[in-house]
């Protein structure tokens, strides 16, 4: 969150008038109470004469492409003569009598923009009337000329301190569990603890916030009929109305300044007020043009497919999980995220409905992510907003708008729902000291909990603590301990470095994982990290049966992307997306592998809450483990395009299903096991080009060419191949026997067998391996040949045989004997014939 130092010190200074702090000290204060700052920066320096001026006369110049005004501005004695200063300006948001900020010749503005006197548009311009952007207060170039309250200072007075150029902006990193700190109210509470200052809640004493609500009448009667439907899970909903405002009244500079320094865009008085209240109190609000609201309001779930145009002028198709605010004419707001164009504030708006609600955090987060629409409002509702602040926020917004744009506040108000009661937590007073190893007194523990906003009762050695409504993250005694330790100073907890146990090296499972990764990398595959999430409709696209094991997915309750809401049971979806992405960017050959855990649902998936103060029982541990998903380690390879690139060394070779199967064998060799393959049908693979990978009698994976329909549906290259194998299902070997080395040479012979097309090459290879005798050391398939001469439905399988003995040099006859024995056995089993 961006917040200026001057605003923080102003809010705390009203209760602590003698408190002064430097930017470095303030930065340390944030860190001391557990908030990291991304950094802080002073407003860019302006040198030279920068003064307050009063516009005395304005002459409209004609004949130019854009409106130009020639102004005479009273800058007192700052120009050395006391005469009116001639300045040409194109802005329209000031008039005669306006107090403005003037940079005179010799001034240098941020960006090294030097001001000098020069003739332009036929008039002498000796200076510049400045906008917020030109002074470094805003990065919005259309921020407009700064107009100050009348009689704010004598013309010619230095303007730097008046417009707040002596300020520093802090970027405070707010963690997801500390939503209350996304406001000046929350941050000043924390800083009061950091610097041991008196804290007065600006939501309780509005004088601290500098807001006078004396003109806001006590509520009486219902303002507008609201139907707050229970399925929306909204806790509270409130509306107040301001009538008869001046729609063109400018937002005062003091408010514009805080909005701009906090990264907000100034729009109009009503909208700026809602943003200011959000920054001050942490309650997001929305302003409707009351004359465009017809009938009552209904807070409901959207209809599936319902359309709505948000304020950013994007038409959005809504989900039935989205919550909307609608009237008799249709949707007016996407609850907790953004309003709509149908009732937005305009230059004709005279009556305003202010809406403040307490939306369900998870519903808001899902809507924001579903529509890729993260707003300042959604950020706060996702983290939790104080449900008790709604009445105060509505009154403050009404008071501010009336003070800026006139009008009156209607006495009627609509307020539905009530704040939920906070749980009372029991904690031993000594618990923080026990955990931290620091002797915290009982008084210290109680004082720190009260600083957070808790109500504390003493019950013997225990404390009964009720967290404040703005701290929904405090649900157990451990949360209370954390608050005490944080505010007392984590840096004061003694550091005791535990003795590190003697290292035992990598475990056998870790060694196997590393060996598999190295082996695949050496084989030409590039490793990627598959995402742990997959699309919700992945297995529908694949056409998997309803009872397929891969559909046993773990659903993520609060996904980062609503379309990727389940944990992966297979690595292939993520890897195939990577192939598509690489091919779309010009890669003609993509050979990837991934080595990662997948997750299969087991049991209810709901973990029991265990007592952290004692060792859980065996039954509790078993229950906990049974609630966790099964997470085996999988390895997958995907290949498309060339496996061997074309070059001076010869023609390239495209990736085929045989390469996918070979990648499985690479994995098996690295793991020290032997794989067998057999033909099967398994989606997403091609029914005729898929092999089951078996370790012993158990199927541990599949490899082959992907199904053409799936290739087309996923925009993959034709004949993309893939392999996936469950590494955890392979027997884990802690040692590998070294191969026996022979001093005698190896003899090579080839064997080509003609078999039916349906006979798997692996089956023939195994028969040769079994029948060729003990002298056979290695057998490999090196060629598959088909031709008309062989006959229809026939193929030739050529194998390379290596023979070697441990005690002598073999003769050709001995090798031929083994070769012929293998051919004979293949003839018996498959009807194979030797090819000349």
From Swiss-Prot:
<feature type="domain" description="FDX-ACB">
    <location>
        <begin position="742"/>
        <end position="835"/>
    </location>
</feature>
<dbReference type="InterPro" id="IPR005121">
    <property type="entry name" value="Fdx_antiC-bd"/>
</dbReference>
<dbReference type="Pfam" id="PF03147">
    <property type="entry name" value="FDX-ACB"/>
</dbReference>
<dbReference type="InterPro" id="IPR004532">
    <property type="entry name" value="Phe-tRNA-ligase_IIc_bsu_bact"/>
</dbReference>
<dbReference type="Pfam" id="PF03483">
    <property type="entry name" value="B3_4"/>
</dbReference>
<keyword id="KW-0030">Aminoacyl-tRNA synthetase</keyword>
<feature type="binding site">
    <location>
        <position position="482"/>
    </location>
    <ligand>
        <name>Mg(2+)</name>
    </ligand>
</feature>
<keyword id="KW-0436">Ligase</keyword>
<dbReference type="InterPro" id="IPR033714">
    <property type="entry name" value="tRNA_bind_bactPheRS"/>
</dbReference>
<dbReference type="InterPro" id="IPR020825">
    <property type="entry name" value="Phe-tRNA_synthase-like_B3/B4"/>
</dbReference>
<dbReference type="GO" id="GO:0004826">
    <property type="term" value="F:phenylalanine-tRNA ligase activity"/>
</dbReference>
<feature type="domain" description="tRNA-binding">
    <location>
        <begin position="44"/>
        <end position="160"/>
    </location>
</feature>
<dbReference type="InterPro" id="IPR036690">
    <property type="entry name" value="Fdx_antiC-bd_sf"/>
</dbReference>
<dbReference type="GO" id="GO:0000049">
    <property type="term" value="F:tRNA binding"/>
</dbReference>
<dbReference type="InterPro" id="IPR045864">
    <property type="entry name" value="aa-tRNA-synth_II/BPL/LPL"/>
</dbReference>
<feature type="binding site">
    <location>
        <position position="479"/>
    </location>
    <ligand>
        <name>Mg(2+)</name>
    </ligand>
</feature>
<dbReference type="Pfam" id="PF17759">
    <property type="entry name" value="tRNA_synthFbeta"/>
</dbReference>
<dbReference type="GO" id="GO:0006432">
    <property type="term" value="P:phenylalanyl-tRNA aminoacylation"/>
</dbReference>
<keyword id="KW-0694">RNA-binding</keyword>
<keyword id="KW-0648">Protein biosynthesis</keyword>
<protein>
    <recommendedName>
        <fullName>Phenylalanine--tRNA ligase beta subunit</fullName>
        <ecNumber>6.1.1.20</ecNumber>
    </recommendedName>
</protein>
<dbReference type="Pfam" id="PF03484">
    <property type="entry name" value="B5"/>
</dbReference>
<dbReference type="Pfam" id="PF01588">
    <property type="entry name" value="tRNA_bind"/>
</dbReference>
<dbReference type="InterPro" id="IPR002547">
    <property type="entry name" value="tRNA-bd_dom"/>
</dbReference>
<keyword id="KW-0460">Magnesium</keyword>
<feature type="binding site">
    <location>
        <position position="483"/>
    </location>
    <ligand>
        <name>Mg(2+)</name>
    </ligand>
</feature>
<dbReference type="InterPro" id="IPR012340">
    <property type="entry name" value="NA-bd_OB-fold"/>
</dbReference>
<comment type="subunit">
    <text>Tetramer of two alpha and two beta subunits.</text>
</comment>
<dbReference type="InterPro" id="IPR045060">
    <property type="entry name" value="Phe-tRNA-ligase_IIc_bsu"/>
</dbReference>
<comment type="similarity">
    <text>Belongs to the phenylalanyl-tRNA synthetase beta subunit family. Type 1 subfamily.</text>
</comment>
<keyword id="KW-0067">ATP-binding</keyword>
<dbReference type="GO" id="GO:0005524">
    <property type="term" value="F:ATP binding"/>
</dbReference>
<keyword id="KW-0963">Cytoplasm</keyword>
<dbReference type="InterPro" id="IPR009061">
    <property type="entry name" value="DNA-bd_dom_put_sf"/>
</dbReference>
<dbReference type="InterPro" id="IPR005147">
    <property type="entry name" value="tRNA_synthase_B5-dom"/>
</dbReference>
<keyword id="KW-0547">Nucleotide-binding</keyword>
<feature type="binding site">
    <location>
        <position position="473"/>
    </location>
    <ligand>
        <name>Mg(2+)</name>
    </ligand>
</feature>
<feature type="domain" description="B5">
    <location>
        <begin position="420"/>
        <end position="495"/>
    </location>
</feature>
<keyword id="KW-0479">Metal-binding</keyword>
<dbReference type="GO" id="GO:0009328">
    <property type="term" value="C:phenylalanine-tRNA ligase complex"/>
</dbReference>
<keyword id="KW-0820">tRNA-binding</keyword>
<dbReference type="InterPro" id="IPR005146">
    <property type="entry name" value="B3/B4_tRNA-bd"/>
</dbReference>
């Amino acid at each position: 969150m961006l917040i200026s130092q001057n605003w923080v010190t102003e809010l705390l200074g009203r209760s602590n008038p003698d408190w002064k702090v430097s930017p470095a000290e303030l930065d340390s204060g944030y860190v001391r109470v557990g908030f990291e700052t991304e950094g802080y920066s002073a407003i860019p320096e302006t040198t030279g004469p920068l003064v307050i001026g009063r516009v005395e006369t304005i002459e409209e110049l004609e004949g130019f492409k854009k409106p130009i005004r020639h102004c005479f501005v009273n800058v007192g004695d700052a120009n050395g003569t006391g005469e009116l200063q001639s300045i040409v300006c194109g802005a329209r948001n000031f008039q005669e009598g306006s107090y403005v900020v003037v940079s005179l010749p010799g001034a240098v503005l941020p960006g090294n923009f030097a001001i000098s006197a020069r003739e332009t548009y036929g008039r002498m311009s000796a200076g510049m009337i400045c906008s917020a952007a030109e002074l470094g207060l805003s990065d919005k170039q259309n921020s407009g000329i700064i107009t100050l309250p009348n009689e704010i200072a004598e013309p010619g007075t230095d303007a730097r301190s008046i417009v707040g150029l002596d300020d520093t902006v802090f970027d405070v990193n707010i963690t997801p569990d500390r939503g209350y700190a996304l406001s000046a109210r929350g941050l000043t509470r924390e800083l009061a603890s950091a610097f041991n200052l008196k804290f007065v809640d600006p939501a309780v004493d509005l004088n601290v916030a500098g807001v006078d609500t004396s003109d806001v009448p006590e509520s009486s009667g219902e303002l507008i009929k609201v139907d707050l439907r229970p399925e929306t899970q909204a806790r509270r909903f409130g509306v107040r109305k301001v009538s008869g405002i001046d729609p063109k009244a400018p937002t005062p500079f003091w408010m514009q300044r805080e909005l701009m320094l906090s990264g907000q865009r100034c729009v109009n008085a009503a909208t700026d007020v809602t943003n200011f209240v959000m920054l001050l109190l942490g309650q997001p609000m929305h302003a409707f043009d009351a004359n465009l609201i017809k009938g009552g309001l209904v807070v409901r779930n959207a209809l599936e497919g319902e359309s709505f145009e948000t304020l950013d002028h994007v038409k959005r198709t809504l989900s039935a999980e989205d919550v909307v605010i609608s009237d008799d004419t249709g949707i007016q707001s996407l609850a907790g995220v953004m309003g709509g164009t149908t009732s937005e504030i305009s230059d004709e708006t005279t009556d305003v409905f202010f809406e403040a609600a307490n939306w369900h955090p998870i519903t808001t987060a899902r809507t924001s992510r579903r529509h890729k629409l993260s707003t300042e409002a959604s950020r706060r509702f996702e983290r939790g907003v104080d449900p008790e602040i709604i009445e105060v926020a509505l009154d403050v917004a009404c008071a501010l708008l009336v003070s800026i744009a006139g009008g009156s506040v209607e006495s009627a108000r609509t307020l539905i729902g009530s704040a939920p009661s906070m749980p009372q937590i029991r904690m031993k007073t000594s618990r923080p000291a026990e955990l931290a190893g620091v002797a915290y007194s009982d008084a210290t523990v109680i004082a720190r909990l009260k600083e957070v906003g808790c109500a504390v009762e003493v019950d013997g050695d225990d404390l009964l603590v009720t967290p404040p409504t703005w701290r929904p993250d405090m649900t157990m005694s451990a949360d209370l301990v954390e608050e005490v330790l944080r505010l007392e100073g984590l840096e004061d907890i003694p550091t005791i470095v535990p003795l590190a146990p003697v290292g035992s090296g990598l475990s056998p499972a870790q060694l196997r994982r590393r060996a598999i990764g190295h082996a695949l990398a050496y084989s030409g595959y590039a490793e990627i990290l598959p995402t742990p999430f997959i699309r919700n409709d992945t297995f529908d696209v694949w056409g998997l049966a309803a009872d397929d094991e891969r559909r046993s997915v773990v659903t993520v309750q609060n996904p980062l992307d609503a379309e990727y809401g389940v944990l992966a049971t297979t690595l292939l979806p993520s890897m195939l997306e990577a192939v598509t992405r690489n091919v779309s960017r010009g890669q003609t050959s993509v050979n990837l592998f991934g080595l990662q855990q997948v997750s299969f649902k087991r049991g209810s998936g709901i973990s029991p809450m265990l007592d952290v103060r004692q060792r859980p029982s065996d039954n509790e541990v078993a229950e906990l483990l049974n609630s966790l998903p099964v997470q085996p380690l999988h390895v997958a390879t995907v290949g498309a395009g060339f496996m061997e690139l074309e070059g001076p060394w010869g023609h390239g070779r495209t990736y085929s299903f045989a390469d996918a199967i070979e990648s499985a064998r690479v994995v098996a060799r690295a793991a020290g096991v032997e794989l067998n393959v057999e033909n099967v049908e398994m989606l997403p693979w091609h029914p005729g080009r898929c092999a089951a990978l078996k370790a012993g009698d158990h199927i541990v994976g599949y490899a082959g060419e992907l199904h053409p329909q799936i290739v087309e549906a996923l925009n993959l290259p034709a004949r993309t191949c893939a392999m996936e194998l469950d590494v955890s299902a392979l027997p884990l070997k802690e040692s590998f026997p070294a191969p026996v080395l022979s001093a005698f040479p190896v003899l090579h012979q080839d064997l080509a067998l003609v078999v039916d097309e349906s006979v798997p090459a692996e089956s023939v290879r195994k028969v040769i391996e079994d029948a060729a005798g003990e002298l056979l050391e290695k057998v490999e398939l090196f060629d598959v040949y088909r031709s008309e001469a062989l006959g229809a439905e026939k193929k030739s399988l050529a194998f390379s045989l290596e023979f070697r003995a441990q005690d002598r040099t073999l003769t050709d006859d001995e090798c031929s004997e083994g070769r012929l024995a293998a051919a004979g056995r293949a003839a018996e089993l498959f009807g194979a014939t030797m090819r000349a």
